[in-house]
Amino acid sequence: MKLFILTFLLYFLISPSNLQLLINVRNQGGDVVQETITANVSEDTVTLEFLRTDGVFVSQIVDFANEVEAMKVVIPAEEELGQTGVQTLCFLTHAAQADFIAPDAMAKLRQKNPGTVRVAEEARGWRQTTATASGARAVALLSSPAARHCAQARDKVYLRQADLARWAPRPGLDQSSYGSLVTPFPARALDTDGAALPPCVSETDRGKECICHLEVCVNWYPCGLKYCKGKPQGGLSYRCGIKTCHRCYRYHFYVQFRHNCYNYT
């Protein structure tokens, strides 16, 4: 019995645990925004959330086990534009080379000076995604954490069909199963030879179809580990910190009616 208790205590003390960090971040406009970063070791996920100064809520999850990244954006209505309620969108992308450090490494971080306002060390520019299909039915097969994350978006879950070929087949399914669970956008929405649908920002008829765009910037996140050389000179290297980055995302997606595009950037 004593051996069991000792083993349990050792496991509890040395095993990675979940971690939540509250980070004060200065955005591009100079305002301070609080980010919440959660590492879930048991699910192998990292989640980052923040509320923008314009009222838009952003929540990003990276599922390392299934190589799925889901960006959820909750947009409040502008009544003067005839909008009502909130609109929730979710964008799925392949995450084999995710920017975030892994959950087990994230869970070992210790926050110093929690009141400090942070600025990212490295700007990683823009990542542009043009969605080609609705993936609301496929998300549950691709990633259970992402499915829960995107549940509020309902049918407004978007992805690129090119990413379907990059996701490894799940147990009991072949690669073609994904294709049957997505709804491609109309061919005219994917036309790139100059006859494509107009962007919603320039379409004045609320009842016309168009291409909506959305921009999201994540101003601070742990994007890598730092290693230092041990002493004396030539000693073994050891982990001595994290590298932090800033990245912006631009999403393009088809909407059947102009009024379904809440124009936030």
For each feature predicted by the language model, list its residue ranges.
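Sequence-pattern detector for short linear motifs
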Residues: 5, 29, 113-115, 121, ...
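An acidic-aromatic
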Residues: 49-105
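Surface-exposed beta-strand edges and flanking loops
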Residues: 25-27, 39-41, 50-52, 63-64, ...
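A eukaryotic "domain-to-IDR transition" signal
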Residues: 85-137, 144, 150
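A eukaryote-biased signal for long
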Residues: 132-265
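Extracellular/luminal recognition modules and glycoprotein regions
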Residues: 17-60, 75
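Short linear motifs in intrinsically disordered/low-complexity regions
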Residues: 19, 64, 100, 105, ...
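Cleavable N-terminal signal peptides of Sec/SRP-targeted secreted and luminal proteins
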Residues: 2-19
